[in-house]
Amino acid sequence: MATTMNAAVSLTSSNSSSFPATSCAIAPERIRFTKGAFYYKSNNVVTGKRVFSIKAQITTETDTPTPAKKVEKVSKKNEEGVIVNRYRPKEPYTGKCLLNTKITADDAPGETWHMVFSHQGEIPYREGQSVGVIADGIDKNGKPHKVRLYSIASSALGDLGNSETVSLCVKRLVYTNDQGETVKGVCSNFLCDLAPGSDVKLTGPVGKEMLMPKDPNATVIMLATGTGIAPFRSFLWKMFFEKHDDYKFNGLAWLFLGVPTTSSLLYQEEFDKMKAKAPENFRVDYAISREQANDKGEKMYIQTRMAQYAAELWELLKKDNTFVYMCGLKGMEKGIDDIMVSLAANDGIDWFDYKKQLKKAEQWNVEVY
């Protein structure tokens, strides 16, 4: 027996633009989108902010699920069907922007945008891969701009559920240099300013380091700062917003997300829906550094939040079906190591030696910048 629940996907936004498109309804056992163009919905009574919505219907099983069989580990490097570098910088694929919407509040320290590009099935990526973007124009030497890689923020089915779109989560880079001049990142500003209907040159897909585990019983610990949330949104959509014949997540997905302010939180409404749908399978903890502190008065960075669950995390790391993924600012890596050093030492284990073993077993996966 199956029932259908409404799972509207809402992206908090004060600025949004969209390109009329016909969304699709694929097989009834998977995610099903209503027909129509993208649109605004202004019903967030708490903040009064405008909300961009993609309405979806998620089919879920109400019967007791059949226990999943233990999945034999296969190296991601040898995983079948994973495509890399179908499109390269010299011959990129030209996609089209369907949607570009700002998903941080106006008072957030910096802008982050969610964008959806069509690829007509020509860039068949997996959750955890990246795509390259080549900004329009030329550099100061008169040459085309170099490729900039971005982690994919959508599942392999894409936000429209038809395997023909790819989504990115991009922060607009603007800073002041030593001479007091305002500098804008070429590719991030190109993307954040991209109008729906515009062409965009894409390369890839690339990468196998961050591919999500195939084991539906796995414990997946995700550590993200800012736009490092992108690959984990792709994981979580597959786990909780889609139904697949060959995959039903029965494990534990635990997300730690670090941001500076509440107004910088990304995809919070989606994560709230996931928690409501699968409270036993999904946990999320936020670390809001400019607004929260621990008992010692220290700012709440991602490693500070993790320290509150240190013993529990260490016990999970002892299991052979626990996988850790880290994506975002490189600075968080040392803080996380500092926590683990003392925990491992309590068991007479050298953390850095143990981490090497985890990496070799593909249970410790890092993509930082």
UniProtKB/Swiss-Prot annotation:
The modification Phosphothreonine is found at T219. InterPro entries: FAD-bd_FR_type, Flavoprot_Pyr_Nucl_cyt_Rdtase, FNR, FNR_nucleotide-bd, FNR_plant_Cyanobacteria, OxRdtase_FAD/NAD-bd, Riboflavin_synthase-like_b-brl. It catalyses: 2 reduced [2Fe-2S]-[ferredoxin] + NADP(+) + H(+) = 2 oxidized [2Fe-2S]-[ferredoxin] + NADPH. NADP(+) binds at S151, K171, T227, V259, P260, S289, R290, K299, G328, L329, E367. Keywords: Chloroplast, Disulfide bond, Electron transport, FAD, Flavoprotein, Membrane, NADP, Oxidoreductase, Phosphoprotein, Photosynthesis, Plastid, Thylakoid, Transit peptide, Transport. It is an enzyme of class 1 (oxidoreductase). May form interchain disulfide bonds with LIR1. It is found in: Plastid, Chloroplast stroma; Plastid, Chloroplast thylakoid membrane. GO terms for biological process: defense response to fungus; photosynthesis. Plays a key role in regulating the relative amounts of cyclic and non-cyclic electron flow to meet the demands of the plant for ATP and reducing power. This is Ferredoxin--NADP reductase, leaf isozyme 2, chloroplastic. It comes from Arabidopsis thaliana.
